[in-house]
């Protein structure tokens, strides 16, 4: 599937500037239209209050600067874009806008100052949005996404879905590494990993696979993150496991670790 409609979530944080730059680069690389959704999010403490002028002024200033950046990208680089400003909670706003996108580019947390809301944002979006989600960690300082990709692979339906959704990005990458953690109980065959490598190579990327052992009781999510970082990856692709009604119970394993402790951009599908 070609990526022709991209959605990027923006807000008044400093990280939104880099998120927009990465989204613009992806849109231009794939000849896509970019929809910029600026969410001026309600704070939990303000639900029963009118927003302060200071907060509104800050959000409006940030949105104006980002809108001006988009206009500049349109003039200088030919970017096709749409702009939407919403005073809303991030979750509902993103879920609605995602209905019309091929890929959503989001921050790794909601804009709320409430830690529980931040943690719930990623899992809620990953489970309830059928569109592939590219989370950009607030801590990232990468200047590009998708040149060197790591695929978190366990032969599951979720991993297969995520890999397939990432094909347009894989086709533009320089190097793709299939990373498999050998847990001893569901070991992946070398032949299967080699076959998958051949599949990806047909999409024009330099592909290889790497198996790592689970040692010292470390979580699989931690192992994947650590190895991906050491390999110089600028994107990890992983399946999202869970069910909308019992997200908190089922996001207790690899998916939760990847979502809550993101070190590099993460593409997930459910």
Q: What do these predicted regions represent?
A:
Residues 81-141:
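Hydrophobic alpha-helical segments and helix pairs
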Residues 44, 91, 113-115, 143, ...:
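Generic structural signal for helix capping and beta-alpha/helix-loop junctions
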Residues 143, 260-270:
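Short, flexible loop segments at boundaries between secondary-structure elements
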Residues 98-99, 126, 170, 230, ...:
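A short, aliphatic-rich alpha-helical micro-motif
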Residues 1-53, 128-131, 145-212, 233:
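Small/aliphatic-rich secondary-structure junction motif
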Residues 1, 72-104, 203-236, 240-247, ...:
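Structural beta-alpha unit
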Residues 106-124, 146, 238-260:
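Glycine-rich, Arg-bearing micro-motifs that act as flexible, cationic patches
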Residues 53-65:
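A short acidic, glycine-rich active-site loop
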